[in-house]
């Protein structure tokens, strides 16, 4: 079963003057070039890669592909073999795949898109698939590589040449599968063009990145591109989500040969979650599927994580793994770093560090913790909003915090080039009676830990796995987890 071809870019290249040799890698960043590598010089949104051709040659590039827009002229003094390619910005991924010999075609590549849940699902898929006999790699927010040995990254979905270079390296290292986060920016900027997705998951569509996309309609349209991908066999859609339910119906009409599976609590779901129970120790749920019915108990927290588990069940079973085996291995998986990450100390408040940085994600994290909160205890929420991002999201985050938490501490979260107090001022109209307003995030975290009762729960939201605070263009070391652990230790 195959999906329609997404209109990406012209795929037919002229005869390439360069063929990959063992050890030669392609890069679009001249700083990554080593002796013998190939430089791909694309026009970018802010910079023109062709300006860095001399630097790439100095670093050892022995071949250059460059963006041929009809205006650029190759300088003969550069004196290395080269080839101009039209519309290279949109075709770089496909070019790199071809130069690498399309080795990623030998991988089971699974893409995950949606506003929230991408990191958890990709990391769980990798853990589960490894236990089922695959050798699985991850490309995503927390890092790239094999589970347990991820290399840090700066983008959820890397640049197109980097994506293909990663897949090539992983295949050379024996990988058989790859679980990949596919961001809306990645889809819109052609970063995944040339990736042979076999299966794709849609998690949800809630407000985020409107500073980039402008409208929710445009945001959703970009996300949906992944499900019209050439060669896609399985579309796995959260039908509890309004946009997801609409997308699933549309795909069934548009792509009759594509296997479309809806998942969620909805009666319309093909992979339906029933008999859901939750506690501070985790959750249990029954999954009714086209492959049978089974129960899974896990230490993961939250109804939204039950949905994420259902997505994993659907993808793994669609790829041929028996349901009983899938549920058995999913019961063993660990949370992704910074996703409902618990710090437990006897006689002290439970601290949960989570990446929730959208109103929907914050609402779900808080509702999950309210469900397991001890009688008479308070749920605290420490959060802020990122600078130089969608301002309209800020009061919505404040409203989600007030609605879901008993005590709210408003602070900073990567203010970037903005004044952090200005960001807080955008949040405060929705927070009528904050427990504290504190620009210094470390002070805010310590305050919550010091003031909370022993049976209270503290959610520190927004940064999750991040180990930095971005202030005025400088990333200073900062870890919510480290600050909270130290504060708990000092509490006595």
Go through each PLM region and give its residues.
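ATP-dependent carboxylate-amine ligase
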Residues: 1-22, 32-38, 48-51, 257-259, ...
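Phosphate-binding loop of NTP-binding sites
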Residues: 9, 90-239, 245-258, 310
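N-terminal leader/targeting and accessory segments in enzymes
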Residues: 1-94, 98, 242, 269-274, ...
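Short, active-site-adjacent cap segments at secondary-structure transitions
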Residues: 71-73, 144-146, 186-188, 242-246, ...
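Short secondary-structure boundary segments
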Residues: 67-69, 182, 204, 239, ...
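Short, conserved loop/helix-junction motifs that constitute active-site signature segments
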Residues: 57-59, 75-77, 193-196, 226-231, ...
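Acidic, Mg2+-coordinating active-site environments of NTP-dependent enzymes
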Residues: 72-76, 173, 188, 197-351, ...
């Amino acid at each position: 079963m195959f999906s329609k071809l997404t209109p990406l870019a012209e795929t037919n290249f002229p005869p390439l003057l360069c063929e990959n040799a063992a050890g030669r890698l392609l890069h679009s960043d001249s700083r990554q070039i080593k002796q013998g590598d190939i430089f791909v010089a694309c026009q970018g949104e802010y910079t023109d890669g062709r300006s860095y051709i001399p630097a790439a040659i100095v670093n050892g590039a022995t071949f250059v592909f460059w963006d041929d827009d009809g205006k650029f002229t190759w300088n003969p003094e550069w004196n290395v073999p080269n080839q101009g390619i039209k519309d290279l910005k949109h075709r770089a991924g496909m070019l790199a795949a071809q130069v690498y010999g399309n080795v990623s075609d030998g991988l089971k590549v699974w893409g995950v898109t949606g506003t929230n849940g991408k990191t958890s699902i990709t990391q769980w898929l990798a853990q589960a698939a490894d236990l089922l006999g695959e050798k699985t790699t991850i490309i995503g927010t927390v890092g790239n590589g094999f589970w347990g040995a991820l290399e840090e990254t700066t983008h959820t979905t890397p640049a197109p040449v980097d994506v293909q270079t990663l897949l090539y390296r992983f295949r050379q290292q024996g990988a058989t599968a790859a679980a990949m986060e596919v961001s809306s920016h990645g889809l819109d900027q052609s970063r995944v063009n040339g990736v042979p997705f076999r299966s794709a998951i849609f998690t949800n569509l809630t407000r985020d990145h409107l500073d980039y996309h402008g409208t929710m309609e445009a945001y959703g349209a970009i996300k949906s591109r992944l499900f019209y991908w050439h060669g896609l066999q399985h579309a796995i859609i959260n039908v509890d989500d309004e946009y997801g339910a609409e997308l699933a119906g549309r795909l069934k009409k548009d792509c009759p040969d594509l296997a479309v599976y809806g998942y969620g609590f909805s009666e319309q779901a093909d992979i339906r979650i029933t008999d859901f129970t939750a506690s501070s120790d985790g959750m249990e749920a029954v999954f009714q599927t086209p492959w049978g019915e089974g129960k899974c108990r896990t230490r993961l927290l939250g109804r939204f994580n039950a949905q994420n588990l259902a997505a994993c069940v659907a993808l793994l079973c669609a790829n041929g793994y028996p349901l009983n085996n899938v549920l058995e291995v999913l019961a063993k998986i660990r949370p992704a770093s910074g996703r409902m990450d618990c710090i437990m100390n006897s006689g002290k408040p439970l601290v949960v560090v989570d990446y929730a940085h959208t109103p929907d994600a914050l609402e779900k994290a808080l509702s999950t913790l309210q469900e397991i909160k001890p009688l008479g205890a308070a749920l605290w929420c420490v959060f802020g909003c990122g600078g130089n991002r969608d301002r309209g999201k800020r009061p919505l985050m404040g409203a989600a915090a007030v609605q879901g938490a008993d005590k709210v501490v408003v602070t900073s979260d990567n203010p970037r080039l903005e004044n952090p107090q200005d960001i807080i001022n955008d949040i405060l109209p929705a927070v009528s009676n904050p427990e504290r307003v504190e620009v210094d995030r470390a002070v805010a975290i310590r305050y919550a830990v010091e003031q909370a009762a022993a049976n209270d729960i503290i959610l520190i939201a927004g940064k999750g796995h991040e180990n930095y605070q971005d202030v005025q263009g400088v990333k200073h070391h900062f870890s919510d987890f480290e600050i909270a652990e130290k504060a708990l230790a000092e509490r006595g």
